[in-house]
């Protein structure tokens, strides 16, 4: 469970490392956030005003319980926000942080969601943190049936062990080529 990573400061540290890159991509200086397990919750945006105590104030102090791991429900809600509610005609980079693979029954559903969204303006950058195995996410790059490759994955056992340059390079490894492919397919403008 990711509970220990919230309590020991790992997730707070990851947020602090990701915020600078998110600020470069976001138009309003805020990073939208969700917490997920079997279900999900939309959380208040992360910004320069609240990032330093975000995990404590918005997650641990609110008593969110961490259960199993299902990606598809939260991915559908993320897509709903960016494709229906906000309807911005700009590419969207999702930094999807997880501490482990999803449950078996969620894998085909997640495959379906990724395929369905492969002709939309959303790129999924999955980031595995901690000591878990990520066999499902490692196979994601070879998922067939997509209009274009709309997802990438890397794992970092300890986010403190890599430099900002290394982290940003990993985060943006496939995003520029996705932008080019999405433009050539008329998915984004």
List the model feature ranges, each with a label:
Residues 24-25, 79-90, 114-118, 185-188:
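Surface-exposed acidic, glycine-flexible loop patches that form ligand/cofactor-binding
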Residues 1-45, 53-89, 94, 104, 130-135:
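Von Willebrand factor
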Residues 7-14, 64-75, 106, 164-172:
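Phosphate/oxyanion-binding active-site loops and adjacent basic polyanion-contact surfaces
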Residues 46-49, 133-182:
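Von Willebrand factor A/integrin I-like adhesion domains
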Residues 101-144:
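VWA/integrin I-like adhesion module and closely mimicked acidic/polar interface patches used
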Residues 1, 18, 90-105, 127-129:
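DG-centered beta-turn motif at the end of beta-strands
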Residues 32-37, 93-99, 125-128, 153-155:
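Extended hydrophobic secondary-structure segments that form protein cores and membrane-embedded regions
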